[in-house]
């Protein structure tokens, strides 16, 4: 009889991962997350980071973190509903509401927590959640926590969405349509105006997870809702503070009613300590910086367009991305992972993405160009893509 403490069942599952070629070890960075990094002791060009604007190591933002620690200490010490709600947390929510051009904002400890806490808080038995089939895992998990019924519509397929809405028009008290603003694996933008039109036509609420749109799309990076001019017509907008903003945390933007309800029923808010002052102070500075200039978003888009053009000219399939996210689609899963490995051996770190994260036969490496990259770095990366692509007969 096996010793239960040896966790033999997990050892067997781990071996299955190794047999399938999808076992991985956590890469170790030796320094800040920038355009070039020290990874496992080797200097490489970084094309895997969500640090879109280069804010994660921005000197002005780092100083704001240090100043906040000096004034407030290193931790909040409690959940916000008890004694963990400092005036700096309130200031952050005011700044974010101004940035997102919404009535109110509720900050959570992560973007994942936003979806885990909000979806279950605003839906219940007798409601229907209608989710794009390619939505982020945190949306899927958040929906699972709700007692509402769930269904999906084909990715960005408005005819299918309308069919689902028609079929369920009179069956539920409330309906909630959920979509990513920008889909992280392909970089495509949700057809949000059409979704909102259908939601209003059939009396449904709209919920947008804008993790990869905030700081990227819209005026000064205000996001997908701003990009399409849909303020006041989207009920819940989720934003992350760990990607373009460069720190940690997430938020829900919407009405005062939304915020009031989540302060009573948002479980991650109620049962987990609030963000530490250093994070809050640095986020405030980052958002103010973003509102004050388009320098960083302009540089991001300039770099993204430059890289896409160069990679496409080599003959790689980069899909139909409408954002800086640039998938280089290889196809067969094993080749995609081998391509990623060879790129790293040649000084470029870019993540291999395979099933079940993407559909079978669409294995890829996902390139994340940032405002922090120089043209020289991007040129070097393109040369490595060309070299490895030719060696593997991909070009």
Curated annotation (Swiss-Prot):
InterPro entries linked to this entry: Aminotrans_II_pyridoxalP_BS, Aminotransferase_I/II_large, AON_synthase_class-II, AONS_Archaea/Firmicutes, AONS_Archaea/Proteobacteria, PyrdxlP-dep_Trfase, PyrdxlP-dep_Trfase_major, PyrdxlP-dep_Trfase_small
Residues the entry annotates as binding substrate: 24, 136, 357
Reaction catalysis annotation: 6-carboxyhexanoyl-[ACP] + L-alanine + H(+) = (8S)-8-amino-7-oxononanoate + holo-[ACP] + CO2
EC number of the protein: 2.3.1.47
Gene3D superfamilies: Aspartate Aminotransferase, domain 1, Type I PLP-dependent aspartate aminotransferase-like (Major domain)
GO biological process entries: biotin biosynthetic process
CDD domains with a match to the protein in the record: KBL_like
Binding-site residues, pyridoxal 5'-phosphate: 111-112, 184, 209-212, 240-243
Keyword check for Membrane: no
Positions where N6-(pyridoxal phosphate)lysine occurs in the chain: 243
Keywords: Acyltransferase, Biotin biosynthesis, Pyridoxal phosphate, Transferase
Annotated pathway: Cofactor biosynthesis; biotin biosynthesis
Cysteine pairs bridged by disulfides in the record: none
PANTHER family per UniProt: CLASS II AMINOTRANSFERASE/8-AMINO-7-OXONONANOATE SYNTHASE, LD36009P
Function: Catalyzes the decarboxylative condensation of pimeloyl-[acyl-carrier protein] and L-alanine to produce 8-amino-7-oxononanoate (AON), [acyl-carrier protein], and carbon dioxide.
Family matches, as NCBIfam families: bioF, gly_Cac_T_rel, PRK06939.1
Family per similarity comment: Belongs to the class-II pyridoxal-phosphate-dependent aminotransferase family. BioF subfamily.
Protein name: 8-amino-7-oxononanoate synthase
Source species of the chain: Alkaliphilus metalliredigens (strain QYMF)
């Amino acid at each position: 009889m096996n010793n239960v403490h040896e966790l033999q069942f997990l050892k067997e599952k781990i071996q299955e991962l190794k047999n399938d070629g999808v076992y991985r070890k956590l890469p170790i960075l030796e320094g800040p997350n920038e355009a070039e990094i020290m990874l496992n002791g080797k200097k490489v060009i970084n094309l895997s980071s969500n640090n879109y604007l280069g804010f994660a190591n921005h000197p002005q933002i780092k100083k704001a973190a240090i100043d906040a620690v000096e004034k407030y200490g290193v931790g909040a010490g409690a959940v916000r509903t008890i004694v963990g709600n400092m005036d700096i947390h309130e200031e952050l929510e005011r700044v974010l509401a101004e940035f997102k051009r919404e009535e109110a904002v509720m900050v959570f400890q992560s973007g994942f927590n936003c979806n885990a806490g909000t979806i279950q808080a605003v839906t219940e038995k007798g409601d229907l959640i209608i989710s794009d089939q390619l939505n982020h895992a945190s949306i899927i998990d958040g929906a699972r926590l709700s007692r509402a019924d769930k269904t999906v519509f084909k990715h960005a397929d408005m005819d299918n969405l309308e069919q689902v809405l028609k079929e369920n028009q009179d069956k539920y008290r409330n309906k909630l349509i959920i979509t990513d603003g920008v889909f992280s694996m392909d970089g495509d933008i949700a057809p949000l105006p059409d979704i909102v039109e259908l939601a209003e036509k059939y009396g449904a609420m709209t919920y947008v997870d804008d993790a990869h749109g905030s700081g990227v799309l819209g005026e000064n990076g205000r996001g997908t809702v701003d990009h399409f001019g849909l303020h006041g017509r989207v009920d819940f907008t989720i934003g992350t503070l760990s990607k373009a903003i460069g720190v940690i945390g997430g938020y829900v933007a919407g009405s005062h009613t939304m915020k009031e309800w989540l302060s009573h029923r948002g479980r991650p808010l109620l049962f987990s300590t609030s963000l530490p002052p250093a994070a809050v102070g640095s986020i405030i500075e980052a958002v103010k910086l973003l509102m004050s200039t388009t320098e960083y978003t302009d540089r991001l888009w300039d770099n993204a367009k430059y890289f896409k053009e160069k990679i496409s000219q080599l003959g790689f399939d980069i899909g139909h991305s409408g954002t800086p996210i640039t998938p280089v689609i290889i196809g067969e899963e094993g080749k995609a992972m081998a391509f990623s490995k060879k790129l790293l051996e040649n000084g470029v770190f870019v993540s291999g993405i395979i099933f079940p994260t993407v559909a079978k036969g669409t294995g890829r490496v996902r390139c994340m160009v940032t405002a922090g990259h120089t043209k020289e770095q991007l040129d070097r990366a393109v040369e490595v893509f060309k070299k490895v692509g030719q060696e593997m007969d991909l070009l």
